[in-house]
Amino acid sequence: MAKVFAIANQKGGVGKTTTCINLAASLVATKRRVLLIDLDPQGNATMGSGVDKHTLENSVYDLLIGECDLAEAIQFSEHGGYQLLPANRDLTAGEVVLLEMQMKESRLRNALAPIRENYDYILIDCPPSLSMLTLNALVAADGVIIPMQCEYFALEGLSDLVDNIKRIAELLNPQLKIEGLLRTMYDPRLSLINDVSAQLKEHFGDQLYDTVIPRNIRLAEAPSFGMPVLAYDKTSRGALAYLALAGELVRRQRRSSKAAQPT
């Protein structure tokens, strides 16, 4: 059964969409079956996967409000090799419409339940706020991957996010946990970045991924061509970093599965 991970941070511009697209493609490169869900009304993960958000017949919005089933909405990312549940501007209305629906915070979880056996990983790209859409992602998820820049104000925002994850786990999704913190746009030449990184390691320990994602021009260029960096420039530092992250994620899952088995 698929592990479902929400890629979330209430702060924008930290690399959520970049991580979602490139981690999905890198997991495919390790022969895993992957579904990427774009839950951000901007639809950047959709466009970055090579799917035109302006020509969609069905999207994640239609799925959430019950106007289509999953099979009618899913697209395929040719360059990424993963399946995609796309988003467009219609999703902006989802915030209001969902508030009026029964089981509003569980719509995504219920929609995914019948197809979790079809995938190894399901990754959800969340909007940069604790909205009804993000709440749906966190209720559907097994864990949260938090991309973040190593800067001063990021630590303050991280504390709020961790508190919100704990609250959702207590009230709506007992299995929800922080899967890992991912340092993005990382430049080890800057002393502030190293200081913040050390604080993260001290506070979060093994929850902090060993892999760091460097600042890399290829990572910035790839979305404009509608492809993951692995398809755009597989030898770039960005591509190699996300391959390393995929490997680290798979190893963690393997260890976690072994630890959960009865002796």
Report residues per predicted region.
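P-loop NTP-binding core
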Residues: M1-T263
